[in-house]
Amino acid sequence: MGIAHTEWESVIGLEVHVELNTESKLFSPARNHFGDEPNTNISPVCTGMPGSLPVLNKDAVRKAVLFGCAVEGDVALFSRFDRKSYFYPDSPRNFQITQYEHPIVRGGCIRAVVEGEEKTFELAQTHLEDDAGMLKHFGDFAGVDYNRAGVPLIEIVSKPCMFSAEDAVAYANALVSILGYIGISDCNMEEGSIRFDVNISVRPRGSRELRNKVEIKNMNSFTFMAQALEAEKRRQIEEYLSYPNEDPKKVVPAATYRWDPEKKKTVLMRLKERAEDYMYFVEPDLPVLQITETYIDEVRQTLPELPHSKYMRYITDFDIAEDLAMILVSDRHTAHFFETATMSCKNYRALSNWITVEFAGRCKARGKTLPFTGILPEWVAQLVNFIDRGVITGKIAKEIADRMVSSFGESPEDILRRHPSLLPMTDDHALRAIVKEVVAQNTASVADYKNGKAKALGFLVGQIMKRTEGKAPPKRVNELLLAAMRDM
């Protein structure tokens, strides 16, 4: 990117549609469940039959209020539904029921760590609305599945408070973590239960103006989100640089784009509609939604400890690395696994590394995550304790971890009982002989160590561990090696 490009910055906001995991739809008793046969979870309400009337789902309201409390938003005592009119085959009523002017939650914030820096991203509002159906294409024809029509959504709208792709991805990750902790959505991006639309404009660095924004629809991975934002930033900057004397509104018009991952570029879908094009008006078949302060307080009391609070506690109380703490708290199941393991092991740093690095990598290779493998937290704690007590070496511990992930049903103790060959070397006489032999064969390294080159000691230890196949106790190896070199 040239110097001219570095003189510009992105201004980014996100609109996130989250399907709520209620039993039934937002305004009808039809089942809310993904993956069923097409058009089996429908009712007169969600298919727009004449005379059908919507009835608001109480559980959807509670989940929206719970989210508002989680992000410290202002939950409205009075909110209202509106009709957003548009024609499309997946909208059988030709309108969506949403909250245009009076949302259920205003404000709030999402806290995230971006490249080691803690940032707070402000929310504009969160509102309830129902989802559309799905168009499915089959060669030369298309079908409509209304199973999703009427599924309850919250749309979470941020302020334009992000200034890089890294900001946007960190915000999105933090948001998904919060939703997972409070349990209001499964956030399955592949199934579309959470969908990210990103809005981006650019401006000269130091400027406060907000130029026309471009919306990039339906980001279904964080990798694509980052790529799309970077590509669109470049496109807009190049447009402005190509037409420096033109009206900025004409150079980059407000529009909706999609991301093409193969071409690595954003592709125009349509120019932006205006609000009046949707002909918003008050939903006549629903009363004003009224809730009480008492109800909001009752919902707030059910909040669990949230990811950011847990993250701060981990790095202060457990003194673990910030990057590992972030991985641990990103998923509530992993955090629970770690905290259960800490009841049996007090080497928190080693424990966090084994959970987030060693076991996570092994489990990922098998398409699983550690909390859902059958491996108990106590077993990982036992493995770390065995290393700390010198029962096994780090190399043997990795072999045991391999076997734990392969079997998903054995503790380190069970594995050592069945495979005594994994136990460390206990023959001190044989170990002394190996140390003596290594020292005799590497006199240059011994001399280097005596001349102050600390790395030479590591080399000698490595040679001994190689000959013992990693089974020699490291502490004993160091003791014998230092003694042997002193005697030379």
From Swiss-Prot:
<dbReference type="InterPro" id="IPR042114">
    <property type="entry name" value="GatB_C_1"/>
</dbReference>
<protein>
    <recommendedName>
        <fullName>Aspartyl/glutamyl-tRNA(Asn/Gln) amidotransferase subunit B</fullName>
        <ecNumber>6.3.5.-</ecNumber>
    </recommendedName>
</protein>
<dbReference type="InterPro" id="IPR018027">
    <property type="entry name" value="Asn/Gln_amidotransferase"/>
</dbReference>
<dbReference type="InterPro" id="IPR023168">
    <property type="entry name" value="GatB_Yqey_C_2"/>
</dbReference>
<comment type="similarity">
    <text>Belongs to the GatB/GatE family. GatB subfamily.</text>
</comment>
<comment type="function">
    <text>Allows the formation of correctly charged Asn-tRNA(Asn) or Gln-tRNA(Gln) through the transamidation of misacylated Asp-tRNA(Asn) or Glu-tRNA(Gln) in organisms which lack either or both of asparaginyl-tRNA or glutaminyl-tRNA synthetases. The reaction takes place in the presence of glutamine and ATP through an activated phospho-Asp-tRNA(Asn) or phospho-Glu-tRNA(Gln).</text>
</comment>
<dbReference type="InterPro" id="IPR017959">
    <property type="entry name" value="Asn/Gln-tRNA_amidoTrfase_suB/E"/>
</dbReference>
<dbReference type="GO" id="GO:0005524">
    <property type="term" value="F:ATP binding"/>
</dbReference>
<dbReference type="InterPro" id="IPR003789">
    <property type="entry name" value="Asn/Gln_tRNA_amidoTrase-B-like"/>
</dbReference>
<keyword id="KW-0547">Nucleotide-binding</keyword>
<dbReference type="GO" id="GO:0050566">
    <property type="term" value="F:asparaginyl-tRNA synthase (glutamine-hydrolyzing) activity"/>
</dbReference>
<dbReference type="InterPro" id="IPR006075">
    <property type="entry name" value="Asn/Gln-tRNA_Trfase_suB/E_cat"/>
</dbReference>
<dbReference type="Pfam" id="PF02934">
    <property type="entry name" value="GatB_N"/>
</dbReference>
<dbReference type="Pfam" id="PF02637">
    <property type="entry name" value="GatB_Yqey"/>
</dbReference>
<dbReference type="GO" id="GO:0070681">
    <property type="term" value="P:glutaminyl-tRNAGln biosynthesis via transamidation"/>
</dbReference>
<dbReference type="GO" id="GO:0050567">
    <property type="term" value="F:glutaminyl-tRNA synthase (glutamine-hydrolyzing) activity"/>
</dbReference>
<keyword id="KW-0648">Protein biosynthesis</keyword>
<keyword id="KW-0067">ATP-binding</keyword>
<dbReference type="GO" id="GO:0006412">
    <property type="term" value="P:translation"/>
</dbReference>
<keyword id="KW-0436">Ligase</keyword>
<dbReference type="InterPro" id="IPR014746">
    <property type="entry name" value="Gln_synth/guanido_kin_cat_dom"/>
</dbReference>
<dbReference type="InterPro" id="IPR004413">
    <property type="entry name" value="GatB"/>
</dbReference>
<comment type="subunit">
    <text>Heterotrimer of A, B and C subunits.</text>
</comment>
<dbReference type="InterPro" id="IPR017958">
    <property type="entry name" value="Gln-tRNA_amidoTrfase_suB_CS"/>
</dbReference>
